[in-house]
Amino acid sequence: MILTSNVKLMPGSKVEAVIQISKEFVKAKYNEILKDYSSRLKVKGFRTGRVPFSIIEGKYSDNIRALAIENLIHKSLEEFFESAIYKPLSYAVPKILDEKLEINFDKDFEFTFVYESYPEFEISDISNFKVEIPEVVISDSDIEDELKLLQFENSIIVEDNGSVKVGSIVRVDFVELDDSLNEILATKRQDFVLTVGESDDYYGFGYDIIGMKKDEEKIVEKNYGSDYKFSELANTSKRLKIGVKDIKRRDIPELDDAFAKDVKDSLNTLEDLRDYVRENMLRVVQEKTNSLKLSKLLSGIAEKVNIDVPSSMFEAELKNVINEFSHQNKINITQLQNSSTGLEGVNDVFKENVLNKLKSKLVFQKMVDNDSSEVTELDLENELIKQAQNLKMAPQDVKKFYKERNLFGLLKDEIKRQKVKEKILQDLEEIKLEKVSFRDFVNYKTGE
């Protein structure tokens, strides 16, 4: 169909392409549409399918030509992109540059369009690349902290017949009172639940209810300083009526051999549990170290390589990040986009961080594309077995899941990405930095 096509790269990873279609093909396509019109058109004095072409062209020539042009562009773009050197972004729509396209049967049909493509760049040798990684120290206190977390996770909530204390889980009603001690109904809240000393309640009355018992009511005077966490309450005074409706406490299990057995059936003693916790912590450190090493490598490469990120690619990534932020923080995306943190209001530092992370992703994808290794049937089988073990399912059921949803292609891509990642980490040299605690290291942001 396409007679010739010429392309040239432009700034912003845009590609300008000129497509030429032979006049013979154009005429054939025009006649095809004309025949279709003739077969369906009803004109007084003629039977359907017997209307002379000259009459149809005299009345519908502009429509037929417009339809022919639309068809030619659509089909030629499909053919062009099937073998295009510069692959288009799936979410970017090609833009026709010609203001007015016309068919001239004496000339080949030609049109020019621009589309955004995957960025073109090369990665130099990384064999001498080094990354700096902190040395992680797992202390006895770190292990004890993890044991406390396990105790907390395995605790149960029970009724407390005593008074409110730090750590109590309390259900309260509260309302603001005016100077005449009348309730300000707009501020009334019922069945509000907080953990005393832990929850961040709006009025900050958690410590004021310590000592209260179930069904007890109390009026509390609150004075808020200029630096109060909620600015609308800063430099104000409030009078609150608070009623305690329910008091519960967290029943923490004893740290003993029986608890170890409850955590994992194969553990018999508390010392076994400590060893188990240490092993898990070492695994977390290794996983985090690998993430940090890869993140530093990719960002380091991205800084040295000129990656011309297309605007539509960046906008799509920015929207994904904002959507993820909205989901994690339970913020309605419409409200978020209408606020100062919407796409137009996102600050430059945030955008720069998103852009840098996007470049790191592009660098890694380029490394995957450049890797010549293939995913074998054995690799695929091993991954299915691994997933089956993790999900406690039969391997054939996991295989059926991927087959029914036609997801084997995606699974193979993910396996290759993992193989490339392992190869990179195996060859990557690291320089140990200062020692850091386990908790500080786990809370460290990798930039991924």
Curated annotation (Swiss-Prot):
Any GO BP: cell division
Chief localisation class: cytoplasm
Residue ranges annotated for the PPIase FKBP-type domain, each copy included: 167-253
One Pfam family, short name: Trigger_N
Reactions this protein catalyses: [protein]-peptidylproline (omega=180) = [protein]-peptidylproline (omega=0)
MF terms in GO: peptidyl-prolyl cis-trans isomerase activity
Subcellular location: Cytoplasm
Functional note: Involved in protein export. Acts as a chaperone by maintaining the newly synthesized protein in an open conformation. Functions as a peptidyl-prolyl cis-trans isomerase.
Family affiliation: Belongs to the FKBP-type PPIase family. Tig subfamily.
Domains as described in the record: Consists of 3 domains; the N-terminus binds the ribosome, the middle domain has PPIase activity, while the C-terminus has intrinsic chaperone activity on its own.
Name the UniProt record assigns to this protein: Trigger factor
Native source species: Borrelia recurrentis (strain A1)
